[in-house]
Amino acid sequence: DGDKIIVRLASQGSFTSGSSDLRQAFTPTLTRLGNSLAQYPGSVMVEGHTDDVPVAFSERFKSNWDLSAARAASSAACVLTSTDLEGGNVQIAGFADTRPLDTNDTPSGRARNRRIEVIVDDN
């Protein structure tokens, strides 16, 4: 097995609730991350994760699966358009609430589960 680097970014402050539109203040964070990732060989997976609260009042997203995938795509697009990272090395995935870090029974647990993870694999 090869080594992996996992960068975990909390969604608080990065997206508006129920949206995949990046907040402008979050863009510099993704740009810095992308510039760092461009220095490493290997593949990059951008994963979107949500809590277990269903998406409400959204015509665009029918489920947390849709929302998590769209957030991963939005994050990857930001990195690719603002850095020298090669697009052929980047993949996206949405996992909805299937890989929680914490309980979904508390506000703090749900907040921890809403995140973007960027995984760098040297294979």
Predicted feature locations:
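Short amphipathic alpha-helices and their capping/turn segments at secondary-structure boundaries
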Residues: 1, 30-39
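Short edge beta-strands and adjacent turn/loop segments
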Residues: 1-8
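Periplasmic OmpA-like peptidoglycan-binding domain that tethers envelope proteins to the cell wall
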Residues: 8, 14-28, 49-123
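A general structural motif
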Residues: 37, 41-43, 87, 113
